[in-house]
């Protein structure tokens, strides 16, 4: 499954109402560690059909970033049934991201 670009308009439908767990990657284009995590998140999205993967650009979607209390990036959040079940700040290897799920 491909990565979904999450914004305030599709957040409710794609994340809150999802019947699958959702891995969210809060990032910014200028963030070096975010650029390290991005291809890993893309890879997970392609490999795992049992989850949704979304990316949220904090510069464009600052309301969503604030709602999640994201002040450092990259921040990875796992949501199930519309609730946060796991969260990690900073770059992580693939194994650690998969373990969050």
What does each of the following model-derived ranges do?
Residues 26-43:
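Conserved redox-active cysteine motifs that mediate thiol-disulfide chemistry
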Residues 77-101:
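Non-catalytic, surface beta->alpha helical segment in thiol-disulfide oxidoreductase systems
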Residues 19-21, 38-56, 62:
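Conserved helix-turn-beta segment immediately C-terminal to the redox Cys motif
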Residues 62, 68-77, 95:
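Structural micro-motif
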Residues 11, 24, 41, 57, ...:
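Residue-level signature of catalytic and energy-coupling elements of molecular machines
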Residues 3-21, 62:
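A short beta-strand-turn-helix
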Residues 2, 7, 27, 52-54:
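Conserved Rossmann-like nucleotide-binding pocket used by diverse enzymes
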Residues 19, 26-30, 72:
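Short pre-active-site segment immediately N-terminal to redox-active cysteine/selenocysteine motifs
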């Amino acid at each position: 499954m491909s990565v979904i670009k999450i914004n305030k308009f599709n957040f409710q439908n794609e994340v809150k109402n999802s019947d699958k767990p959702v891995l969210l990657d809060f990032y910014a284009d200028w963030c070096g560690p975010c650029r390290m995590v991005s291809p890993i998140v893309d890879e997970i999205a392609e490999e795992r059909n049992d989850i949704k993967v979304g990316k949220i650009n904090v510069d464009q979607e600052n309301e969503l970033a604030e709602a999640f209390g994201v002040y450092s990036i990259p921040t990875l959040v796992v949501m199930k049934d519309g609730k946060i079940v796991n969260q990690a700040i900073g770059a992580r290897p693939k194994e650690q991201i998969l373990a969050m799920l």
